[in-house]
Regions:
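Interdomain "pre-motor" coupling segment immediately N-terminal to P-loop NTPase/helicase cores
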Residues: 1-7
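P-loop NTP-binding module
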Residues: 5, 12-166
Length: 166
C-alpha cells in the first residue's frame, strides 16, 4: 500500500473518493490475494496489527473493509485498540459506546453497530477506554460476539492494538 500519511491528518476511508486511484488499486490487490489464501465457505475473520502505534493499522482496516464491501460482501470492523482507539475518528463519529461497553454488558450489539456511507460496511467503535482492555478481549463474551457476527457478516475485520509495547 503506498504511503499516504502526509496527505491526510487521520486514518479515513479514501477508496470511495477515487476508486481508480493507486491506493484503491492496492487495496483491491490485497482483497484478491486474501481470496486465494482461504477460499472455504463461511465468514472470515481478519486481524490487522503492527508492532507499534502509528504504522497505519486503522487506515488499512478502514480501506480494506471498504474495498471488500465494494465486492458485495457484508463487512464489519471491530475496534479492539482500546488504549488508542481510532476507528471513530476515521468515520467521524463519537466514541460513546462500543466494544468496551458491549463486552461488559452495558450496551447490546444492535446499539453499538454503526453504518458507514458504503453499503454493507458497518463498524463498532472501541467505546470508552477501559482499565483492562486485554481482559475484555480474551473474555468468553468476545468469543460469543465473534460467533454471532459470523452469521451476520461475510468478513469480520479487527483493528487490533499493536503487538509491541503500548
Amino acid at each position: 500500500v503506498p504511503k499516504y500519511k502526509k496527505e491526510i491528518p487521520i486514518s479515513q476511508l479514501l477508496i470511495d473518493k477515487n476508486p481508480k486511484s493507486l491506493i484503491a488499486e492496492s487495496f483491491r490487490t490485497i482483497r484478491t490475494n486474501l481470496q486465494f489464501v482461504d477460499n472455504t465457505a463461511g465468514a472470515k475473520t481478519i486481524a490487522i496489527t503492527s508492532t507499534i502505534s502509528g504504522e497505519g493499522k486503522t487506515f488499512v482496516a478502514i480501506n480494506l473493509a471498504g474495498i471488500i464491501s465494494f465486492s458485495g460482501k457484508r463487512v464489519i470492523i471491530l475496534d479492539l485498540d482500546m488504549r488508542k482507539p481510532k476507528i471513530h475518528l476515521g468515520f467521524g463519529v463519537e466514541n460513546i459506546r462500543g466494544m468496551s461497553t458491549l463486552l461488559i454488558g452495558k450496551d447490546d450489539l444492535e446499539s453499538c453497530i454503526q453504518h458507514s456511507t458504503l453499503p454493507g460496511l458497518h463498524f463498532v467503535t472501541a467505546g470508552p477506554i477501559p482499565p483492562n482492555p486485554s481482559e475484555l478481549i480474551i473474555s468468553a463474551k468476545m468469543s460469543e460476539l465473534l460467533d454471532g457476527l459470523k452469521s451476520m457478516y461475510d468478513i469480520i475485520l479487527i483493528d487490533n492494538p499493536p503487538v509491541g509495547l503500548v
